[in-house]
C-alpha cells in the first residue's frame, strides 16, 4: 500500500488536535498527540505565522514523517515588520517599510519555492508582494526599487548575500 499525504496549514508552534489536523489524521489511525507534538517542535521558529505542513503516512506501519514548508511571503514580511496584517488600501495606506537586507533575507528563505532563477529575481518577487501589502522598500515605492535592482543599484548587497 502506498503512503498517504495529508497537507494542512497550521500556526507555527501551536498545532492542536482539533481542526484542521485532528479530522485529517484521525481516520489514518495515528496517535494525534504524537503528530501534533512533532509538528509543534518542527514549526516553533515560525511562531505566529501560518505554516504549510505535509504529513506523510504509511497506513500499514502507522509510521509518519513531517515536512514543513516555508510560510507565504506575506507572512514572512508581516513577521519581519511586526505587523498584524497588510494594508486594506495598499496604494493609499502604507503600513511599513522593508530594508533591502530584509528583502534579501526573505528572498533567501523562499528561494527554493519560487520560480526565480536568481536571488535578484527572488527579491523582486518579494518586493511585488510588499507592494500589494502597502509596504515600501527603502522608503520608496516598491516599483521604483525593482527598477533600481534592474539598474544595478543593489548589486553589492546581492553579491554579498550570495556568498553567505
UniProtKB/Swiss-Prot annotation:
Pfam families: Ribosomal_L11 (PF00298), Ribosomal_L11_N (PF03946)
Keywords: Ribonucleoprotein, Ribosomal protein, RNA-binding, rRNA-binding
GO molecular function, one term: structural constituent of ribosome
Alphabetized CDD domains for the sequence: Ribosomal_L11
Chain segments annotated as coiled-coil in the UniProt record: none
SUPFAM superfamilies listed in its UniProt record: Ribosomal L11/L12e N-terminal domain, Ribosomal protein L11, C-terminal domain
Taxonomy, superkingdom: Archaea
GO biological process: translation
Assigned GO CC terms: large ribosomal subunit
Function: Forms part of the ribosomal stalk which helps the ribosome interact with GTP-bound translation factors.
PANTHER family membership: 60S RIBOSOMAL PROTEIN L12, LARGE RIBOSOMAL SUBUNIT PROTEIN UL11M
Subunit structure: Part of the ribosomal stalk of the 50S ribosomal subunit. Interacts with L10 and the large rRNA to form the base of the stalk. L10 forms an elongated spine to which L12 dimers bind in a sequential fashion forming a multimeric L10(L12)X complex.
Family: Belongs to the universal ribosomal protein uL11 family.
Record's protein name: Large ribosomal subunit protein uL11
Organism: Pyrococcus abyssi (strain GE5 / Orsay)
Gene of this entry: rpl11
Amino acid at each position: 500500500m502506498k503512503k498517504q499525504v495529508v497537507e494542512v496549514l497550521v500556526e507555527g508552534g501551536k498545532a492542536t488536535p482539533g481542526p484542521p489536523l485532528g479530522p485529517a489524521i484521525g481516520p489514518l489511525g495515528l496517535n494525534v498527540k504524537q503528530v501534533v507534538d512533532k509538528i509543534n517542535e518542527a514549526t516553533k521558529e515560525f511562531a505566529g505565522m501560518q505554516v504549510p505542513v505535509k504529513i506523510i503516512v504509511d497506513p500499514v506501519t502507522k509510521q509518519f514523517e513531517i515536512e514543513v514548508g516555508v510560510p507565504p511571503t506575506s507572512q514572512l514580511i508581516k513577521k519581519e515588520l511586526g505587523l498584524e496584517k497588510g494594508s486594506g488600501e495598499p496604494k493609499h495606506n502604507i503600513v511599513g517599510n522593508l530594508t533591502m537586507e530584509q528583502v534579501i533575507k526573505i528572498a533567501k528563505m523562499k528561494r527554493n519555492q519560487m520560480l526565480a532563477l536568481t536571488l535578484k529575481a527572488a527579491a523582486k518577487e518579494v518586493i511585488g508582494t510588499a507592494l500589494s501589502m502597502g509596504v515600501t522598500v527603502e522608503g520608496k515605492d516598491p516599483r521604483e526599487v525593482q527598477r533600481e535592482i534592474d539598474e544595478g543599484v543593489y548589486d553589492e548587497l546581492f553579491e554579498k548575500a550570495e556568498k553567505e
